[in-house]
Amino acid sequence: MTTPLAGRPLLDAHVNSPDVLAGLQRAFNLYEDALVHNKVDVLDALFWDSVHTLRYGAKENLNGYSEIKAFRASRPSVGLSRDILDCHIVTFGSSAGVANITFRRAGEPRVGRQSQTWVKFDMDFADGWRVVSAHVSWMDL
């Protein structure tokens, strides 16, 4: 359902326009597949190539695309599978959105949390959607 923003919107007018939401969901699914199968080139392509891009992980704070890319290249390629417990994707206008999930990994008693801010750029791959900010953390139960 498309919901107009309350008050005076500072971006174009709708939350979760069906076509925009579908595009971000496709990009998110592409990201998730690349993550669990260690497709580093796809992960790199889905992050905004900018010094302004951030990724705060469970054990690291990465500032800028080059730090994120170096992290991806050096991380272990095993133990990446996870089960998504809950997923919330919301788009704002035609070029911004957020994706938030909770997940579990085999052998890990904690619940993982991931938040991503996505912006749509004038690019072909993944309909132009890029992660501009990400945060991963663990929650003790």
What are these regions (language model features)?
Residues 27, 39-42, 72, 85, ...:
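Hydrophobic alpha-helical segments typical of transmembrane helices
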Residues 46, 52-62, 73-78:
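A short gly/proline-enriched turn/hairpin at secondary-structure junctions
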